[in-house]
Structure formats: C-alpha cells, structure tokens
C-alpha cells in the first residue's frame, strides 16, 4: 500500500449541473465502492437539501480500488467538490489535497463562469487536468464546438478529451484509465516524520469531531499523539480510516493517502482547516502553507417568530456551527423583533441553505432581516469602524466618509440576452471592465457593489436570461461611496428591523417601494397610520393607511341633531386618545413579506 506510484488523488471540478456528482456515482459503482442495492443518486451528497437542489455543499472524499488494464491495482482518492461560488473555499481545500483534476464540462452548454474559476484554481495548484465532456447522449450535445470553446477560453489541449455520459454510464472505463495514465502519483515522501494537511472537519454525535487529512510525509496510525501546529493542541488518535464512501477503519494512513481520524476533539472550532498535523514527539520543522481564512461577506439577522423559541435557536446555531466553520453568529436584540442573532455567511446561497437547514433539521420558524454587507466607516475624530448592522451606523454628522465593498463579476450569457444583462448591471451601478465573444456566447466582466448583489441580482439575472446566464464573483476592493441609512417609521416610531444602508441615488426609490409594500401588509386600525421612509431627520416618502370608522350613528333614527353630535364628539375624543397612547402592532406576516429579498 505504501507504493505511492499506485495512488492517484484527484478532484472533480465543474459548473453547477454539469454532472460532477453523477460522474462520482458512476465511478463508485464501477469500482465496487458500494453494492448495487446501496447505490442512490448523488450518493456523496449526504444532506437532503443537497439532493433536492441538485448541488454539492460539503466536499466529500472516497477511496476507490481500480484494477487497470495494465494489470496493476490502483487506489484512487476522489474529492467531490461544490460548484457554487459561495463554496469556492471548499473547492480550494479539495484542490490543495490533490495532484490532478477531472474538468467536467456539459457538452450541451459549454464553458460557464464557474468552470473558469475552478479551472484557474486547479492551475494555480499545479494540477494535471483531464478534460471530460459529459451528457454525450443528449440530442443537443455539441462536443466539437465545446472543445473549440475550451481551447479558446481556457487554453488547454482538448485532443485527448474523454467523451462520456455519466447518467447512462457510457465511457466511465475511459475516465478511469485517463486518471491512472495521465494524472501524476503523489510526490515521494521526503521524510518519515508525520506531516499532514487538515482538509476538512465535521461533527459526529458518536465520535466527536471527525478530521479529514491528506498525509504528505510519514504515516498516521492509531494511538499516536499528534499536535496541531496552528493551535499547539495535542490529541491522542483513537481511530484511523478512509471512506469508500462507507466508513472503513484501518491501522495506518501512509504518505500520499487521504483519510480520516478521530481523537476525542469536542469542537470543530479547535480544528483549523489548512492546519498542519504532526507527531508530538518528533514534530516536523515547517508547517504547510495552509489556506486563506474564509471571511463572511453577507450578514443578516435571524429571529424566532415566537420569542420562547430563542434558546432552541441558540442551540441549533451552535450545532450547525460544529459542521460549518465559515458561518458566524452573535446575539443582538431589536425593539420590533425581540432577541435574535446577527449571522455572517459566504454568500446568498449559503444564507438560504443555513436558513433552510434551521427550518428543516431543527423545526424553527424564523424571520430574516434584509441582508447587508460590511461597510468601512471613517469618523471625523479619526476612528475607523467596520459595521454590518444598519442599526450600528453612527450619526451622519460624525462621519467623514464611508466605503463599501465592490466585487469583480464574470458573467457568461448567450448573445440574445446580452442587452437585458447589460442594462441590469448598469441599473445596479456596475462598471464594465471587459467584453468578449466566444462562439455565440458573450463573456462580460463587471465591477459591481456587493450591496446591490445581495438583494435580488442573481434572481433577476436568471429571469432576464431565461436561466442561461452564469455568474461568478470574487471580492475586489473597498471604495468610498455616498451611502445613507434608510429608516422606516410607523406612526413616528422607528422600526429598526426594516432599516437598511443604501446608496443615496437609490434611497428614495427603495424607501417608496417599502412604504407601498407595508401599506398593503399592515391591517387597518381605528386611526390613520403614517408609514414614512427617512434619511436622518428628512422624510423622503410617505404612505397613509386610512382609519377604519365605526358608524356610531347607525342606531339614531332621526331625532335631535345634538344627540348625533354628542356621539360623534365622543368618538373623536376616543380616536384622539388612541393616537396619543395607541401602539401599532405590525403583524409578523407583514415583517416577513416586507423583508423578502428584492424589490418587486
């Protein structure tokens, strides 16, 4: 087993829906990783939400045993990676643990924006790349055209591309032969001292934290005392093994292998991804380079609809955090919504998935406030702040300048939808950086404010291109911007949960839209309700919900006018008292609808 020349570590990279997980299923089936009765679609996507949405969120690993045509038995370690931009960090971790990649491209759709990002990441990691063209059995498949597109855009040789249909299993043996013959084995171990890369970790209710590692030098065996170099914490290894994708316990993991171990670690936070693991008695001299830390870019408030559920929400977030170290949260309170948490996410899909997991796995009913990003505030007294909650924004008089984050977005779109996509980017304050054509598809690169993206950009991009546009982005720079805090007042009371930070040019439009929406959502009361949008002390939009009026004269048939006047005066005095002391109850349904992402 310690013949490293018979090991191949590879990851599968592709855009969403191009067939990564299906190809992984076929490879597992072909190599007998699971018996036929144990196979299911997307066998590596363990969460229900992954299967339903057809996306991969957590990278998974499998060891396959393959008897090649040259008569040798090879051990193939497959890392299935996510395709969505929010989980690019998961991709970078998987790539760092491998020497080669299978680049899967849908032969009916060609190169998409995320394909490019993942390929460039693989090239940065010095990966050997095997090109696989999938969905060959579909009538719309155009392999030759897609090959030309790949050569033009990415610049890799397509003459030895493997043509397959992962769904029907055509060409799977060719993929396995290409892995064995074209991808390099791990580098020879230069030392007997343990040096391993911590690729991922997750929480298992029975075993504690399970750690996925790639052994670079030496070996990892049961009962060894190991040290994490970033935290200097020492643990005793309890179990060592690998996935096929079922868990298999083994005695030892040799150099070049990818596997897991458990060591009675209580929290995932104690295991920093990208850390170097070494032997406590004979530590290695130098740590591995590791990864860039993953910082949240989108923030929003999560509140339980019923305040008695707060403790349940707190426990649920702590459990999710055990498996997802990139997700952050802290407690906050709102006068309108009560006590909840301010949470940080990698992007909107990440936000949606955490929300959905909370409602499904923990049966929670939540209100989500409008998403926001991190702003840099420069105060007149020289202090610099970073805020992501509109409620924390200081008084505008004390602020010297504000900076907002901008992103660099790559959009691939068929040319017939180009006009609609360009006008959407312009509407979102975008600046065009580049524009090129590949066959009948346009590739545009835009600089866009992240603040505009987190609302409804992705949905609107998909609808204006009938679902054909693909979009990928990375953080670019912070730039000064004319930002203001848009406040919403109901009967002169500020509703903090509806406050947002917007660009001054969009404030009036967004304020008016929110007022109109709230007017439809808040039920009529016995008095007039004023809904106002404000910037500081200036009101920029107003809507009024007219009062319900009880007919107090309904029982007066004729009779003296003074009797009627007395009843009307009594009603008037009652309404005046209500205006003075009455609190307007905004129903939860109104909050939820008003906070729906995007402007209708």
Swiss-Prot record:
tr-type G domain span: 5-187
A Gene Ontology BP annotation from the UniProt entry: positive regulation of translation
Keywords: Cell inner membrane, Cell membrane, GTP-binding, Hydrolase, Membrane, Nucleotide-binding, Protein biosynthesis
PROSITE patterns the UniProt entry points to: G_TR_1, G_TR_2
Membrane topology: Peripheral membrane protein
Cellular compartments annotated: Cell inner membrane
Stored CDD domains: EF4_II (cd03699), EF4_III (cd16260), LepA (cd01890), lepA_C (cd03709)
Positions with a binding annotation for GTP: 17-22, 134-137
Enzyme superclass (EC): hydrolase
Subcellular location, principal: membrane
Catalysed reactions listed for this entry: GTP + H2O = GDP + phosphate + H(+)
Superkingdom of the organism of origin: Bacteria
GO CC annotations, alphabetized: plasma membrane
Family annotation (Pfam families): EFG_C, GTP_EFTU, GTP_EFTU_D2, LepA_C
Biological function: Required for accurate and efficient protein synthesis under certain stress conditions. May act as a fidelity factor of the translation reaction, by catalyzing a one-codon backward translocation of tRNAs on improperly translocated ribosomes. Back-translocation proceeds from a post-translocation (POST) complex to a pre-translocation (PRE) complex, thus giving elongation factor G a second chance to translocate the tRNAs correctly. Binds to ribosomes in a GTP-dependent manner.
Protein name: Elongation factor 4
Gene: lepA
């Amino acid at each position: 087993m310690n013949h490293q020349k018979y090991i191949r570590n590879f990851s599968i990279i592709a855009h969403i829906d191009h067939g990564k997980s299906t190809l992984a299923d076929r490879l597992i089936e072909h190599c007998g990783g699971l018996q036929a009765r144990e196979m299911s679609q997307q066998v590596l996507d363990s969460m229900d939400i992954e299967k339903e949405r057809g996306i991969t969120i957590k990278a998974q690993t499998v060891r396959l045993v393959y008897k090649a045509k040259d008569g040798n038995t090879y051990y193939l370690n497959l890392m299935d990676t996510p395709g969505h931009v929010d989980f690019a960090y998961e991709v970078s971790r998987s790539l760092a643990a491998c020497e080669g990649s299978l680049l899967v491209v849908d032969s009916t759709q060609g190169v998409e924006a995320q394909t490019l990002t993942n390929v460039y990441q693989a090239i940065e990691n010095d990966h050997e790349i095997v090109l696989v063209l999938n969905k060959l059995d579909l009538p719309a498949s155009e392999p030759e055209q897609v090959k030309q597109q790949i050569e033009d855009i990415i610049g890799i040789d397509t003459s030895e591309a493997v043509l397959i249909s992962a769904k029907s299993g055509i060409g799977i043996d060719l993929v396995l032969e290409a892995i064995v013959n074209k991808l390099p084995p791990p580098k020879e171990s230069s030392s007997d001292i343990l040096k391993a890369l911590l690729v991922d970790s997750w929480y298992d209710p029975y075993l504690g934290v399970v750690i996925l590692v790639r052994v670079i030098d030496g070996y990892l065996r049961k009962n060894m005392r190991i040290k994490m170099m970033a935290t200097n914490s020492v643990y005793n290894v309890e179990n060592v093994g690998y996935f096929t994708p079922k868990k298999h316990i083994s005695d030892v993991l040799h150099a070049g292998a990818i596997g897991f171990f458990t060591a009675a670690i209580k929290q995932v936070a104690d295991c920093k991804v990208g850390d170097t693991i070494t032997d406590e008695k004979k530590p290695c001299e130098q740590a591995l380079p590791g990864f860039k830390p993953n910082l949240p870019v989108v923030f929003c408030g999560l509140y339980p609809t019923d305040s008695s559920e707060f403790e349940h929400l707190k426990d649920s977030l702590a459990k999710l955090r055990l498996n997802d170290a990139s997700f952050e949260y802290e407690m906050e309170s709102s006068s309108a919504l009560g006590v909840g948490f301010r949470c940080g996410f990698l992007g909107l899909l990440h936000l949606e998935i955490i929300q959905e997991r909370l409602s499904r796995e923990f049966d929670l009913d939540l209100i989500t406030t409008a998403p926001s990003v991190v702003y840099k505030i420069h105060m007149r007294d020289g202090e610099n702040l970073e805020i992501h909650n509109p409620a924390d924004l200081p008084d505008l008089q004390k602020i010297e300048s504000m900076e907002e984050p901008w992103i660099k977005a790559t959009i691939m779109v068929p040319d017939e939808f180009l006009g609609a996509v360009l006008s959407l980017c312009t509407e979102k304050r975008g600046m065009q950086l580049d524009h090129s054509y590949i066959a009948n598809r346009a590739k545009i690169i835009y600089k866009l404010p992240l603040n505009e993206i987190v609302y409804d950009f992705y949905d609107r991009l998909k609808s204006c291109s009938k679902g054909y546009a693909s979009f990928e982005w990375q953080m670019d720079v912070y730039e000064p911007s004319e930002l203001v805090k848009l406040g919403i007042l109901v009967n002169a009371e500020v509703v903090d949960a509806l406050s947002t930070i917007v660009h001054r040019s969009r404030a009036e439009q967004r304020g008016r839209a929110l007022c109109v929406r709230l007017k439809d959502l808040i039920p009529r009361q016995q008095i007039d309700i004023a809904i106002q949008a404000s910037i500081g002390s200036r009101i920029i939009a107003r809507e009024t919900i007219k009062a319900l009026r009880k007919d107090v004269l309904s029982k007066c048939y004729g009779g003296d006018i003074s009797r009627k006047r007395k009843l009307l005066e009594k009603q008037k005095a009652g309404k005046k008292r209500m205006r003075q002391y009455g609190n307007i109850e905004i129903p939860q349904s109104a909050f939820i609808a008003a906070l729906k992402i995007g402007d209708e």
